[in-house]
Curated annotation (Swiss-Prot):
It holds the Pfam family Rnf-Nqr. It comes from Neisseria gonorrhoeae (strain ATCC 700825 / FA 1090). The lineage of its organism: Bacteria, Pseudomonadati, Pseudomonadota, Betaproteobacteria, Neisseriales. This is Na(+)-translocating NADH-quinone reductase subunit E. It catalyses: a ubiquinone + n Na(+)(in) + NADH + H(+) = a ubiquinol + n Na(+)(out) + NAD(+). It is found in: Cell inner membrane.
Amino acid sequence: MEHYLSLFIKSVFIENMALSFFLGMCTFLAVSKKVSTAFGLGVAVIFVLGLSVPANQLVYSLLKDGAIVEGVDLTFLKFITFIGVIAALVQILEMFLDKFVPALYNALGIYLPLITVNCAIFGAVSFMAQREYDFGESVVYGFGAGLGWMLAIVALAGITEKMKYSDAPKGLKGLGITFIAAGLMAMAFMSFSGIQL
């Protein structure tokens, strides 16, 4: 149990996808203008990561040498299978949001299908394969990585909403000041890197 707790804390804070590895920055910067939209996208990313990392762990275990047929190693297919599983889960999420939460579906717009190619999603799945997590570890890691990404985007959206009323220099208004805020947040999250779990 302690191992899973340390893996969860590590994936949320120490190895934050957005602020430590800088993965998923396109949607991270583009959707971080309103807290409500950022929260909705964060929940969507938690859903996709929470399901795609363990699902891809199961698929990857079938691709390993001797898993299906003795002497056949299909691990060279891992990238295409990872992308296929992620795309299927995002399509399910998109259909669900369109049917049951149309306001969030419309607010996310083009960024919802872009979760399919969000490098934070693919990065978490690749880290799972590289670190050889078992199924339980992949569930904890997927949920923790998604929660960490959501924490980062909601915090940046809150800062961005407050900065609308600030007196920033004209050249830094908009994306410039957002980059500075994201950089300062990343530096703050670097303080977690010295923690050994």
